Each structure stands twice: as C-alpha cells, then as structure tokens.
Amino acid sequence: MQNSYSSAQDTITHDAAAGAASYTKQVLAIYDFLVLGFANTFAWKCPTRLILDFYNQHISNKHIDVGVGTGYFLDKCQFPSSHPIICLLDLNPNTLEVTAKRIRRYNPTTFIANVLEPLKLELTGFDSIGLNYLLHCLPGNMLSKGVVFKNLKPFLNDGGVVFGTTILGQGVPHNLIARKMTSLYNYKGIFGNINDNLEDLKTILKENFHDYSIQVIGSVAFFVGQI
C-alpha cells in the first residue's frame, strides 16, 4: 500500500484540533524522551515496556493506529508476520509524517482524520485498532469520548479488538509531578482528562463492545474491547 493523505471531514472542532496541534516537529523530536522516558517513569508510573508488551499481546496483521505519536510502539512491537497492513489515523500531519517514515518498511497508509466525527474512509476488514494515549488528549468528558469507539468499530472484522491506554484524571494515583503536568496540560488544551475516570471508561466500553477488560497501572488505564 502506498502512503496517501485524505481528509475525513472538511472542518474539525477547535478543541480537538488544539490537542493535535501541540505535536509540532520540534516536540516530536523529544517526545520519546519526554513522554515515554520521563513522564511514563516519573509522573504516570507506567513503564513504557508495559505498553509495548500490551501492543505485542493485541496487535494484528491488519491494524489501524489512531493518534500515532512518533510511531514508537509500531516500530518496536512484534507483528504476527513481517508484512502487516497498517493504516495510520491522526489529525496532525506531523505525527503521520514522522510515524510513516519511522515504519516505512511496512509501507503504511496515512489518513488525516478526526475520530470524534463519523469517518468517511474506505477501510474494512481490520483485526485490531490501537488507541495509545489518545482518549486523554480529546476534549469533553469520558462518556462523550465513547463516540470514538462507535466511529471505529465499522472498520473491524468480527472478533476484532480495539485496545489502548489513557491517563485518567480521577480515581487513580497522581504524584506531585503527575498533578502538575495534568493541570498544565489541561490548561493548555493538550489534555482533556480532568474528569476522566475508571467508571466512565467502563461504561463506554460496555456500551460498545461484546467483551472488554481494563487494567490500571499507575495513572494509566489499559483497555481492550472486542466486538
């Protein structure tokens, strides 16, 4: 598959765009060190290796990744075969460019898309969708973010899974660094997770999936939903 860019909609909400816009090329250059190194270890108390293990457990040969960051996990994870089909979805062309370049050996297809809106994409027959560190960057409360699952489910085969991680704002341990970072990032519009909690995450998973599971490590919820 060749790389291509297509818009899922003509307009996007200001709040959703604010979170995506923070990922400039300069920020992405230090993202792995700042987020996957420092923040995961010292703020969220969720080692990056555990997220990589999570990817290895649920990744498939036909995979969509949403909110792609730098592509670290797609680069490091172990796909079931050496020739997976990968689609990348994000609002930010910078993250798509960086990730597509990083995993160019897989020749991914890229789409600029807002998952809070219906997705007019000709994608079907996928077995896994990854949402790593996406939900806490979206505006609104956790219950309103259930629309993301609704919009993505049509792209999955029967038995397919949506899996991901999200930093919760309530009901999980937050040390001083985590509290400061959460407050600052919400103020700047990078995060939208002040009111995100475990019970609401359970609710939107239950509403959208035949089966689901959640595990909390530090300030981070790991979730899987199967259709």
Label each PLM-derived region with a short phrase.
Residues 62-118:
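Class I SAM-dependent methyltransferase SAM/SAH-binding core
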Residues 163-214:
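C-terminal alpha-helical "lid/dimerization" subdomain adjacent to the S-adenosyl-L-methionine
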Residues 120-129:
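A short acidic, Gly/Pro-enriched loop at the edge of an enzyme's catalytic core
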Residues 132-136:
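Residues lining the SAM
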Residues 208-227:
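Core SAM-dependent methyltransferase catalytic element
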